[in-house]
Amino acid sequence: MRSLTVASRHPGAAFSTRRRPLLHPAAAGRDSTFQRCWRWEKTQDSSFGSSLRTSRLPRTVHGDILKNLLAPTAGAVSVEQAEAIADLPKGDMWSVHKFGGTCMGTSERIHNVADIVLRDPSERKLVVVSAMSKVTDMMYNLVNKAQSRDDSYIAVLDEVFDKHMTTAKDLLAGEDLARFLSQLHADISNLKAMLRAIYIAGHATESFSDFVVGHGELWSAQMLSYAIQKSGTPCSWMDTREVLVVNPSGANQVDPDYLESEKRLEKWFSRCPAETIIATGFIASTPENIPTTLKRDGSDFSAAIIGSLVKARQVTIWTDVDGVFSADPRKVSEAVILSTLSYQEAWEMSYFGANVLHPRTIIPVMKYNIPIVIRNIFNTSAPGTMICQQPANENGDLEACVKAFATIDKLALVNVEGTGMAGVPGTANAIFGAVKDVGANVIMISQASSEHSVCFAVPEKEVALVSAALHARFREALAAGRLSKVEVIHNCSILATVGLRMASTPGVSATLFDALAKANINVRAIAQGCSEYNITIVLKQEDCVRALRAAHSRFFLSKTTLAVGIIGPGLIGRTLLNQLKDQAAVLKENMNIDLRVMGIAGSRTMLLSDIGVDLTQWKEKLQTEAEPANLDKFVHHLSENHFFPNRVLVDCTADTSVASHYYDWLKKGIHVITPNKKANSGPLDRYLKLRTLQRASYTHYFYEATVGAGLPIISTLRGLLETGDKILRIEGIFSGTLSYIFNNFEGARTFSDVVAEAKKAGYTEPDPRDDLSGTDVARKVIILARESGLGLELSDIPVRSLVPEALKSCTSADEYMQKLPSFDEDWARERKNAEAAGEVLRYVGVVDVVSKKGQVELRAYKRDHPFAQLSGSDNIIAFTTSRYKDQPLIVRGPGAGAEVTAGGVFCDILRLSSYLGAPS
């Protein structure tokens, strides 16, 4: 093995508190590294070497470059010759940290990194760093421009120099700054010579490119070392090309040589026995000591390899997120940070495209059960996500068994099908041999147990080659009919459901496919290994995000998460929104009921949200962010939002056209809750059709507030019927407005004065005739009659209107109120007649179930009757049944007003939640 030469002024000896100069083989060993690289390149690429030797540079410049690059530093010694000073300790005393380019992006961030390292109480610390943010891309760009003979590579190199010089000046001072800038100048000079040679040759081999690119890590490691040294902490920095040895194993892949790397690390440590070591990420050497890199996510890989070599207690990878998400937060805003993952779960997620770790990063630490912790450098209070051997199972329920979801897009599904495949040995080998020959990557395989077909997923960009190869390979079989087809399905995606404990938990697949079915997602292929670490599903790419949201919401959101659409932000709707705002947090905390208002629709405008309207600002947003009202679009927004498992439309209007849509909404799987009486008191055939659909499906339709506002009238009636009681008669004061009017129509007060008072207090509609006509009471009578099993139409109910015939033609409410006093004498006469009999007047609705009739009328009741005891705007309903024949069951309470009506609607929302699984 060739010696790795290092300068005698190597920083190998750890910094003492006296602050010895920070030096490294970069001063000399880096030149010798270039020598090795250069000697290797001469054997590999004579044209490049010739270009460097014969480039048309001035002789003096050419000579200076070669002297600067190739001359070994005086006094250099080999690693093998270094005298052992200390053995490398191994075990839990080591903690390994890795900081990526974002963490090292500015002088302020490097200072923060130094603080984190210094605050770590571990006995020994090994810190792996990437190049500063964007620097690696800039270095690759340098090489690409140079070999393309683009002179602008010089400007890019100047940008690299300026970036590091500016950072160093902000971070360092005095001798530290002078030493770093001296080395930086020397490195830039060397790079200019190399890039000039590449420019002349028009070509750069991989090892030269790797050598150039690796400088970013060298510079960031030096700057961090100086920053830590400023605190007086002993520190060394390591060029990992001297330690990590890897073997190329394929395109953009390398395999670590752990034994040789361990030997070199021990020798390095014998010269540099520091308690804090700053190591370069990403870069390494081949067994021939040629510079190379660890390819994609190389710095994470470096940290994992080094962590395994020292058998560290933990490897912490610092990034800019709080940990590993349960799904891509760009696609699923409700994705949560996972506290733990097993190695296998992290591997599966990484394979299927989740931004966790590269799968190979996990391999080195698994052998020694070393945890990897993903943490956020910008939020150090967050504990992050721990990836370890077997995380503790907090609760063992179904949801806990599914840890995360990941997706891969831009795939194609290849299906090879034919009766001639069954029982024929070697068919699968022939299929995948053809795929291998064109270098395609098979991501998923699924085979029918009958062996009639095999399908597999490949990247869309590779499917044309795969299809051609399969048609060529099976030309005869296709012609003979042994294979029926080689089919390609384009524009596919994979959704992977990952969880270590899915194998031991029944119902995971059923729950997953139920969620996809409810989201109207068609599954094209399925694969699941016997280990059951993941369930892989192929589906249309256009359905992928919707499927991801539906699956994630089913496993990670509460079963009683409700996507709510409010139609009609008038008096009742506005009050309901305020009640939801005040109570939402309590419901989520105490009952795990998560209510999300996804939209608010008025008659002119509507407000839509994908994740939920902020109810503290809904009024303002309805003014500033609203769009023109469109009921179809509003409903589509709610029904197509499969991010939430349950959807409910709350109609707070009194609009007939809105009520006419209930059937269609229920058919789409949207629950409906309303105080709107129009649907249940409308045409009987529509009502029966609506109720039939409700009973035949698992979609709920609640309308408690249609009768009695917030009073439990409908639920009481249903309870009686469902327990086998027989309803004989329902009689009650159903109108809060008319209850108020007749409760106060006594003594010397005139009827018109009481109506005016009720109007002023807000008890009546803007036009009091809407209340006094009795139609609203008739609708409530119809609703109760139909609940009791009577097939009555609204026209079957005789109604005594309290609006005189002469006033029905008034063109406005004001005109009506002006003319109403002329009828006070008639009302006074009727009241006196009742008083003379010891009675009071009450406006009531009656359902006579026995005679199958209903009516609305003004009746007189004795003063000791419960109906005569009312006050304010209270409602009272008496149920006479087989069980409650002698003493009717009475429900009494406030039956009018926005608060109680909205409260009744709110109760229906909570009732729906309980039906969906909320605790009682």
Swiss-Prot record:
Residue range covered by the transit peptide: 1-92
Chief location bin: plastid
Cofactor: binding details: A sodium ion is seen in the structure; a metal ion may subtly affect the relative position of the nucleotide-binding region to influence enzyme activity, and could increase the stability of the enzyme.
Annotated residues for binding of NADPH: 572, 653, 677, 897
Cofactor: a metal cation
Stretches for region Homoserine dehydrogenase: 567-920
Boundaries of every ACT domain copy: 416-491, 497-574
Endpoints of the signal sequence: none
Name listed for the protein in its UniProt record: Bifunctional aspartokinase/homoserine dehydrogenase 1, chloroplastic
Organism encoding this protein: Zea mays
Name of the encoding gene: AKHSDH1
